[in-house]
């Protein structure tokens, strides 16, 4: 067997998951193998791959999660000159390695002008697939380029890297097996490759094309026992087209003798059973008269009882043989009926940079919920692996995967999934790194937690308030109060150096609050706010923090100090930059009025209410004012309070704007608990899955990207009026990263209910 054949048969590495893979194999059909461990000698020309510098399959050892061997740098070092367009596109992807459209344009341009320069083609594919290893169509194109120049060992190398990068793709395994059939003559080499593939994707609901190719190959070999065994294995799994497979199996059983359908092991077991039956029959006849066993006088012979028995039981054996498979089929169909709705709602079962729609995202959560309840760990792992191919750009699914594996006691799987998420698939999204930091802290890896926070501070999203708060809180939990204070001060110093910082007021406010909560040093907390007012214009978040701070202090309250600062924010000033929106100004005015309602006097309350009416009531829209019918003016306050809230509160006189005066700040000024995952929405209606997926062209799934496609931006939270009783309601400002959002559902999909408006996070929120 040649080197390339050895790689095809056995791959570069052992199968992923360690002990898990052995258990996974036991639930596969009879005869299915795990991917075997490879000896270094099988990859003479690929030592780096064998020795661990190459990628490994999804879910393998956590110390190696690279999924392709990228170029040393983005650029050309092949000795050839770049065209102007190539240079332009390389500059784009160097600046932003996630610019998918620029990458595909660069590949097209390189293929156009460098058809015979395989080194340049390798360079661009290596670099692209290092960023987007799940694009199976581009692995196929890469392999085709290597085949075109006759480098068969390189073709195998590309396919091996491909199945390491997108292990749970039916399509890439199908392309690899097809290549092996067309290239190698040794049936055992090809069969071992099929068996490697089926370990990972044999139970995939959409695995029919791969099973069909395997059946087709064995039909060409006319190895009917292997064909029958493949059908048997298929019928054990609830996959697509089960009815067709069962019908084909019955047709095979009707047209071939049972002796051809049974494997050697099955034939041996049947022979033992027949021999046992014959022995029992002989023992029962031993007491019969001797003359009953003689030949008749006329010389005629009797048919052997054993042969007669064998002849009469063959149809029964065939019926039993088929009946066992039919029972498998019925059981699989029963489970299929439970999952078919989820499977049909998966409109895009492969990776794509375009966002998924809301219905598909919800369907994945619902499907995972169902499989987790079913309790089959192997099914859970494989569905998660399918999910994080389709939903690779969504941190919530990686977080859920890691959390589930942790809860199941599978720390290695959790660690590996987290490494893939943070190092490859969502490496530029801060929430995955914040989750990683918390998980590492829980597991005692304090240095790793600090490194995760530092990565966010320095590279992923510098100045992200959530990261600062969580990092400082961790240092406080560890007893490093000075380090927590220092962290706030360092970030504040950086933000002060910026010409326009959107988070500086929030940083000051949070630092003041944190300082007071952990040290009860009221003077220091007040100094922080006062210092803030020396560096930034008074703003809603800063004023909220100051009002709240005064509210929790013992008398006397510094109302005279607060009043001009609040007025500076809520009064529009043509000569000064207005940093607060009209909604923010009105909300702050209401908060201040409620504060005065408790701690002020009648005179100060009246002044604030009159000012509120003057500033905000004349600007209400005519349509809003029309909502106040004559009955609203005549009805008593109690009647108004009893009216059903319909989500659009009518304008009210200022005197009636605070019905919940007793509902003050939350007790103990404490953060509210936070749980993950969030409550799931109602199950989405199943959508018709596109049946053409299984026969897609190798590259077609990646075509049709709109020109100028860019990653979608996070939606701006809907402003929410903040009653002071629920103080304070505040969102963090929009910062530099944009997590993936759901795409609009296509026209053919069922009409989705509009998502509820996202309430702004409370200023004093749930960060731990």
UniProtKB/Swiss-Prot annotation:
Species annotation: Arabidopsis thaliana
Amino acid composition bias (Low complexity), ranges on this chain: 670-688
Keyword Membrane: no
Renumbered ranges of HAT repeats: 116-148, 150-182, 185-220, 222-255, 341-373, 375-407, 444-477, 479-517
Pfam families: HAT_PRP39_C (PF23241), HAT_PRP39_N (PF23240)
Stretches with biased composition (Basic and acidic residues): 286-295
Coiled coil: none
UniProt GO cellular component terms: nucleus
InterPro entries for this protein: HAT, TPR-like_helical_dom_sf
Protein's name in the database: Pre-mRNA-processing factor 39-1
Similarity field: Belongs to the PRP39 family.
Chain segments carrying region Disordered: 278-314, 668-688
């Amino acid at each position: 067997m040649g080197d390339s054949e050895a790689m095809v048969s056995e791959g570069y590495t052992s199968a992923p998951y360690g002990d898990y893979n052995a258990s996974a194999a036991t639930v596969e059909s009879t005869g299915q193998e795990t991917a075997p461990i490879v000896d270094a000698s099988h990859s003479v020309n690929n030592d780096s791959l064998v020795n661990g510098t190459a990628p490994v399959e999804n879910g393998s050892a956590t110390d190696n999660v690279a999924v392709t061997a990228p170029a040393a740098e983005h650029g050309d070092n092949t000795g050839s000159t770049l065209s102007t367009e190539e240079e332009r596109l390389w500059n784009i992807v160097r600046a932003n390695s996630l610019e998918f459209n620029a990458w595909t344009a660069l590949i097209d341009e390189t293929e156009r002008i460098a058809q015979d320069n395989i080194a340049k083609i390798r360079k661009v594919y290596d670099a692209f697939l290092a960023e987007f290893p799940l694009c199976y169509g581009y692995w196929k194109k890469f392999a085709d380029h290597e085949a075109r120049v006759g480098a068969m060992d390189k073709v195998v190398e590309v396919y091996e890297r491909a199945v390491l990068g997108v292990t749970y793709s039916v399509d890439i395994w199908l392309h690899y097996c097809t290549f092996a059939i067309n290239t190698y003559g040794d049936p055992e080499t090809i069969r071992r490759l099929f068996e490697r593939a089926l370990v990972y994707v044999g139970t995939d609901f959409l695995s029919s094309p791969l099973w069909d190719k395997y059946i087709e190959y064995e039909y060409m070999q006319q190895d009917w026992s292997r064909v029958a065994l493949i059908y048997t294995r298929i019928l054990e799994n609830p996959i697509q087209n089960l009815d067709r497979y069962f019908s084909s199996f019955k047709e095979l059983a009707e047209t071939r003798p049972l002796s051809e359908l049974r494997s050697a092991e099955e034939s041996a077991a049947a022979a033992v059973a027949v021999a046992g039956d014959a022995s029992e029959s002989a023992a029962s006849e031993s007491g019969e008269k001797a003359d009953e066993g003689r030949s008749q006088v006329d010389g005629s012979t009797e048919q052997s009882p054993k042969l007669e028995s064998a002849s009469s039981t063959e149809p029964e054996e065939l019926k039993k043989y088929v009946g066992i498979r039919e029972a498998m089929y019925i059981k699989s169909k029963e489970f299929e009926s439970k999952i078919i709705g989820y499977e049909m709602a998966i409109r895009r079962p492969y990776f794509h940079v375009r966002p998924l729609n809301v219905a598909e995202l919800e369907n994945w959560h619902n499907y995972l919920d169902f499989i987790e309840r079913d309790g089959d760990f192997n099914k859970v792992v494989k569905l998660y692996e399918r999910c994080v191919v389709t939903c690779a750009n969504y941190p919530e699914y990686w977080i859920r995967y890691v959390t589930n594996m942790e809860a199941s006691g599978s720390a290695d799987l959790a660690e590996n999934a987290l490494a893939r998420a943070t190092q490859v698939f969502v490496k530029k999204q801060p929430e995955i790194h914040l989750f990683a930091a918390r998980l590492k802290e829980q597991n005692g890896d304090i240095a790793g937690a600090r490194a995760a926070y530092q990565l966010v501070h320095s590279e992923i999203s510098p100045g992200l308030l959530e990261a600062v708060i969580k990092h400082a809180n961790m240092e406080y939990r560890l007893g490093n109060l000075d380090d927590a204070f220092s962290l706030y001060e360092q970030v504040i110093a950086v933000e002060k150096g910026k010409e326009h910082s959107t988070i500086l007021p929030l940083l000051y406010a949070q630092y003041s609050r944190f300082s007071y909560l952990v040290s009860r040093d009221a003077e220091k907390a007040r100094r922080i706010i006062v210092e803030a007012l020396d560096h930034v214009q008074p703003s809603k978040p800063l004023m909220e923090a100051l009002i709240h701070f005064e509210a929790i202090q013992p008398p006397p309250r510094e109302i005279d100090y607060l009043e001009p600062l609040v007025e500076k924010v809520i009064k529009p000033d043509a000569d000064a930059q207005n940093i607060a929106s009209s909604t923010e100004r009105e909300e702050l005015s209401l908060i201040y009025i409620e504060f005065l309602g408790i701690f002020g006097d009648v005179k100060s309350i009246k002044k604030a209410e009159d000012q509120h009416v003057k500033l905000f009531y004349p600007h209400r829209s005519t349509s809003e004012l029309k909502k106040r019918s004559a009955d609203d003016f005549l009805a008593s306050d109690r009647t108004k309070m009893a009216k059903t809230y319909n989500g659009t509160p009518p304008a009210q006189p200022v005197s009636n704007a605070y019905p919940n005066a007793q509902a003050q700040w939350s007790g103990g000024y404490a953060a509210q608990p936070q749980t993950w995952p969030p409550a799931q929405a109602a199950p989405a209606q199943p959508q018709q899955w596109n049946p053409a997926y299984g026969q897609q062209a190798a590259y077609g799934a990646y075509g049709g990207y709109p020109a100028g496609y860019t990653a979608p931006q996070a939606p701006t939270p809907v402003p929410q009026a903040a009653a002071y009783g629920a103080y304070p309601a505040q969102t963090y400002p929009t910062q530099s990263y944009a997590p993936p959002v759901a795409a609009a559902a296509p026209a053919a999909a069922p009409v989705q209910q509009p998502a509820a408006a996202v309430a702004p996070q409370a200023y004093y929120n749930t960060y731990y």
